[in-house]
């Protein structure tokens, strides 16, 4: 959520930043709604003060009867009625909060202006892409290996699901353990095993609700399946005040994730690129406003390390204003090279959300010896999605005979297995 005080004091800049997100100017409407809310709040405070004064006089009166006493009683009763009506009006006046809840985060000054991914800015590349490399797509390879099943799975769960078998299931498990080990041992992240069912308020805190309600799966009794472990991890500090010396806090978690893929009809209908259920290792950092820029580079580099150790070619893109996620003020996308598609595809998003999520969930910190609190900054990064990493390994490590060479760093995690070959039932 955006800071209403900042909007109040920076109307023109607010409208300019909204325009960078391709949203029409809204400062005038917000000023009107904010003024109305502040007027009601001011009246409530005045009546509360008047009630306090009159109640004190009543309490100090020697005689608890008579015209003066009864007149004061009537005044207090009238004030209570006014207060009840004003408080009801304030509670019913949700338009301002509803409007603020629909605004995305304000873009950082370094974010390039642009409408879509064509305007994203290349930051760096890693590894070489070979235009003459073997170029079967991952699902062709997986099906031929008899270790990736879409057909039978569709009978169980429908489309956009997959069943991995044998050594591909083992590769999935190996990647999870490898990624968690790298992030905990080399990058100082603390491992968490969080719930994957959360309440709506947790989704709201993370910026998933109300705007993206249709993109998650909801149960019939008030829970939602997480679209990313970011939801569970950032809420670890909801409604808390953290001592400054404990920051940064860095969490890593592997969880299954669930997305309805609303609006993705016709996109990536084959294979493992876009599934309703997928596994992902997620990174979350909680830090101070002064350190969040450096922490953004840190968390991005942690994600990149996984691909570097797997020797997979990738590039890092700085997203433009029109391509950034709702809660982010600045985002790097890491895109992996897929020979089967002959293009780079997103494998990770690494975002600095500033105090956007913290304001929603009241996550604060304070200096030692001080009573003053400040909103933390939250950051998140994919570290990485297991399925898309497997896709990249299958396509970049494929051999002429259809077998898959295991990357060196995964051999021990695979129990010494160096190559995945076709499974014969």
From Swiss-Prot:
Mark the transmembrane ranges.
none
Q: Which organism is it from?
A: Rickettsia africae (strain ESF-5)
| Name used for this protein in its record | Serine--tRNA ligase
What the protein does? Catalyzes the attachment of serine to tRNA(Ser). Is also able to aminoacylate tRNA(Sec) with serine, to form the misacylated tRNA L-seryl-tRNA(Sec), which will be further converted into selenocysteinyl-tRNA(Sec).
Q: What is known of its domains?
A: Consists of two distinct domains, a catalytic core and a N-terminal extension that is involved in tRNA binding.
* Keywords assigned by UniProt, alphabetized: Aminoacyl-tRNA synthetase, ATP-binding, Cytoplasm, Ligase, Nucleotide-binding, Protein biosynthesis
EC number annotated for this UniProt entry: 6.1.1.11
Residues bound to L-serine: 228-230, 282, 382
Reactions it catalyzes? tRNA(Ser) + L-serine + ATP = L-seryl-tRNA(Ser) + AMP + diphosphate + H(+); tRNA(Sec) + L-serine + ATP = L-seryl-tRNA(Sec) + AMP + diphosphate + H(+)
Q: Which family does it belong to?
A: Belongs to the class-II aminoacyl-tRNA synthetase family. Type-1 seryl-tRNA synthetase subfamily.
Q: Among its keywords, does the record have Cytoplasm?
A: yes
